[in-house]
């Protein structure tokens, strides 16, 4: 299969290149850029020399339609809204890693992303690609909205409750931490070493654009689920997300019963690992992999459940899940090209 990537010079795009180099069905990778065409790709990422030696190609739909079988879009917001309709018209399936197509209501998107939404028809034709939960829809999809990094960790952590109608949304707090690579490669004051090192800070309080994405999916699984309290924090690490969720425990269920619910729910999901009683995951334990590790417990004193979910934001939170969706779309084993062991320590 010939695969194209728009936005290969970003961290998510570079991770796609790394993964696809090990994918048995990736015959060729063509990397596109509207600003750096002709530039040697390895000049941007020297660690990929002798692995991805190609030059960046110009973005022209006339040539693209004859070059590739599927396109990943790993570009900033706005690019997919422009290119997805063109690629769809050319009959090329698209997996979009941006947030352009995740929010079904254009007005909600514009409120949270502070930019014009993609065409409504394009948004409505996109399948939300949370791989473990949307397999049937993904199998026949031609346009996939790859979930955001925070929503992936949070939704996988809450799905067993919400899909069984057990989520108690009267009290639901999501406290999430991320590594700095989630902010992208472009330099900024907030990601400057002197600002980040030996520091830990909250950001986008009550304004994080992943909030409506989480709420939208929870309401789809358990109608009537209300707003959540979501806080994002920037940790002094390169990769990783830890989402800790606090909610009222399902009525009449012990910690062991809730844990069994989770284990049964994900028993056929290779990439979701439910930790045993008393064992809680750390971001380092999924580093560089497509795994999501989850622990769940119930405090019988407060009758509240605590769910901890960890992922690598560039893998399960972006490129890894995108390739997992590619595998599902094509009827391949989900793990194809994704069986890399977490890098530890």
Swiss-Prot record:
Keyword flag NADP: yes
Cellular localization per UniProt: Cytoplasm
Coiled coil: none
InterPro entries the record matches: AGPR_AS, AGPR_type-1, NAD(P)-bd_dom_sf, NAGSA_dehydrogenase, Semialdehyde_DH_NAD-bd
Alphabetical GO biological process terms: L-arginine biosynthetic process
Family: Belongs to the NAGSA dehydrogenase family. Type 1 subfamily.
CDD domains hit by this protein: AGPR_1_C, AGPR_1_N
HAMAP family: ArgC_type1
Pathway given in the UniProt record: Amino-acid biosynthesis; L-arginine biosynthesis; N(2)-acetyl-L-ornithine from L-glutamate: step 3/4
Pfam name, any one: Semialdhyde_dhC_1
Record EC number: 1.2.1.38
One Gene Ontology term, aspect cellular component: cytoplasm
Leading EC class: oxidoreductase
Main location: cytoplasm
Function: Catalyzes the NADPH-dependent reduction of N-acetyl-5-glutamyl phosphate to yield N-acetyl-L-glutamate 5-semialdehyde.
Protein name as it appears in the record: N-acetyl-gamma-glutamyl-phosphate reductase
MF-aspect GO terms: N-acetyl-gamma-glutamyl-phosphate reductase activity; NAD binding; NADP+ binding
Catalytic activity: N-acetyl-L-glutamate 5-semialdehyde + phosphate + NADP(+) = N-acetyl-L-glutamyl 5-phosphate + NADPH + H(+)
Keyword terms, alphabetized: Amino-acid biosynthesis, Arginine biosynthesis, Cytoplasm, NADP, Oxidoreductase
Catalytic residue positions: 149
């Amino acid at each position: 299969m010939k695969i194209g990537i728009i936005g290969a010079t970003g961290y998510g795009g570079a991770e796609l290149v790394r993964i696809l180099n090990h994918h048995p069905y990736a015959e060729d990778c063509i990397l596109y850029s509207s600003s750096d065409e002709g530039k040697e790709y390895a000049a941007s990422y020297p660690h990929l020399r002798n692995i991805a030696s190609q030059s960046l190609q110009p973005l022209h739909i006339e040539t693209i339609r004859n070059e590739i079988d599927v396109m990943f879009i790993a570009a900033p917001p706005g690019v997919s809204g422009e290119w997805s309709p063109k690629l769809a018209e050319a009959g090329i399936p698209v997996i979009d890693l941006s947030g352009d197509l995740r929010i079904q209501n254009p007005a909600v998107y514009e409120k949270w992303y502070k930019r014009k939404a993609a065409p409504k028809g394009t948004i409505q034709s996109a399948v939300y690609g949370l791989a473990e939960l949307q397999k049937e829809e993904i199998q026949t999809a031609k346009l996939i909205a790859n979930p955001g990094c925070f929503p992936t960790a949070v939704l996988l952590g809450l799905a067993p409750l919400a899909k069984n109608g057990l989520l108690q949304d009267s009290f639901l707090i999501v406290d999430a931490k991320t590594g700095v690579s989630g902010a992208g490669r472009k330099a900024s004051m907030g990601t400057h070493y002197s600002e980040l090192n030996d520091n830990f800070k909250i950001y986008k309080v009550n304004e994080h654009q992943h909030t409506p994405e989480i709420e939208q999916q929870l309401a789809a699984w358990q109608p009537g689920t209300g707003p959540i309290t979501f806080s994002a924090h920037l940790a002094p690490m390169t990769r990783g997300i830890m989402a800790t969720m606090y909610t009222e425990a399902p009525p009449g269920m012990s910690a062991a019963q809730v844990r069994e619910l989770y284990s049964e729910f994900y028993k056929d999901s290779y990439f979701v690992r439910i930790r045993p009683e008393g064992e809680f995951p750390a971001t380092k334990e999924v580093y560089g992999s497509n795994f999501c590790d989850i622990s769940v417990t119930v405090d019988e004193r407060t009758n509240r459940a605590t769910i901890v979910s960890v992922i690598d934001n560039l893998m399960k939170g972006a490129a890894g899940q995108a390739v997992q969706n590619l595998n599902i779309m094509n009827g391949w084993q989900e793990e194809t090209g994704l069986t890399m062991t977490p890098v530890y320590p």
